[in-house]
A protein has these predicted regions:
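Acidic/histidine-rich catalytic cores of soluble enzymes
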Residues: 2-10, 18, 36, 76, ...
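A short, acidic, flexible beta-alpha connecting loop/helix-capping segment that sits on the rim
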Residues: 10-11, 261-272
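Catalytic domains of carbohydrate-active enzymes, especially glycoside hydrolases
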Residues: 21-42, 108
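Active-site acidic/histidine proton-transfer and metal-coordination neighborhood
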Residues: 22, 26, 61, 65-69, ...
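A structural motif
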Residues: 33, 104, 109, 217, ...
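Glycine-rich, proline-tolerant flexible connector loops at the mouths of alpha/beta enzymes
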Residues: 37-62, 116-122
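C-terminal helical cap(s) of enzyme catalytic domains, especially alpha/beta-barrels
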Residues: 270-284
Length: 284
């Protein structure tokens, strides 16, 4: 397993001069990580990353910054709502996915990652989010993005999230089987598959996901959770209730070189979380 970090968590509480792409990348390497999850709009302030900005020059810049630190970009994040009810907005979002795929291809990044949204402009869970119609809309709008991914030779990975359209194993498999694209992959975030309605069945829920989605999992996000009156709150690994034993055993046995990025860390706990995961991984 190759451990990395979500880059916009790095130096997030520091002054602006410490939040440049170069400074964040250098800090990630200093903290002992080998790869990063890169969301450009969250790491480079003051730039609107529409398709016009997603240029060949940007790809060269990204490649140079991370190459200098000997860091891989495990995934280029592009979190735009493909189930937005406005067709014009969907078309704009699709163009930004196309641009992200182009940058990924030119920068040597193997994967663009996304979540699956909600059938409203607010990108918020509502009564229709888990409907069949919402899933059909998402798949319809994902199709041209996958076609472009195939042309660029880049993987397009979706991340199931409990309160999004693709919320569980069954709906994930519906997308995989329905799209029939060799470039469609899965980002496995165990905590994001949990909610207040199923957290007490955590081991069963995650065991099913690892068993049935195994062949499709291309990357992992690792974080922890605590229970609050408003639901589950994500925290850095080692700061909540999560038991990583079965997950790390699965990764060691079935995905030995997979890239796994820590989420919800701070500069104060990132190294501690990395060392925890490394110790647990060595022991399983």
């Amino acid at each position: 397993m190759q451990l990395g970090i979500r880059l916009h968590d790095v130096n997030a509480a520091l002054p602006a001069q410490d939040q440049t792409l170069e400074a964040r990348a250098a800090k990630a390497r200093e903290e002992g990580f080998s790869c990063v999850h890169l969301a450009l709009s969250k790491c480079i302030k003051g730039v609107s990353f529409d398709e016009a900005a997603l240029t060949e020059g940007l790809a060269a810049y990204v490649h140079r910054v991370f190459g200098r630190q000997e860091l891989d970009v495990a995934v280029l994040g592009c979190y735009l709502n493909l189930a937005h009810p406005d067709p014009g907005q969907v078309k704009e979002f699709q163009s930004r996915y196309f641009g992200s795929l182009r940058v990924a291809a030119l920068a040597g990044i193997g994967m663009v990652g996304t979540e699956t949204g909600a059938p409203n402009a607010a990108y918020k869970f509502d009564g229709n989010t888990h409907s069949r119609e919402a899933l059909r809309t998402f798949m319809w709008n994902l199709e041209p993005v996958l076609e472009m991914a195939e042309k660029f030779g880049v993987m397009m990975a979706i991340e199931p999230v409990r309160n999004h359209i693709v919320c569980n194993v069954e709906r994930t498999l519906q997308v995989i089987e329905g799209m029939k694209s060799p470039n469609l992959r899965i980002i496995f975030d165990p905590v994001n598959l949990l909610g207040t309605d199923n957290v007490d069945r955590r081991d069963t829920v995650l065991g099913e996901a690892m068993d049935r989605l195994c062949d499709h999992i291309a990357m992992v996000h690792l974080k922890d959770y605590v229970r609050t009156e408003n639901g589950l709150m994500s925290v850095a690994a080692g700061n909540g209730e999560m038991d990583y034993t079965a997950i790390l055993r699965f990764l060691k046995a079935r995905k030995p070189f997979i890239q796994a990025t820590l989420e919800n860390t701070t500069n104060d706990n990132a190294v501690r979380s990395r060392e925890l995961i490394e110790r647990l991984y060595a022991s399983v």
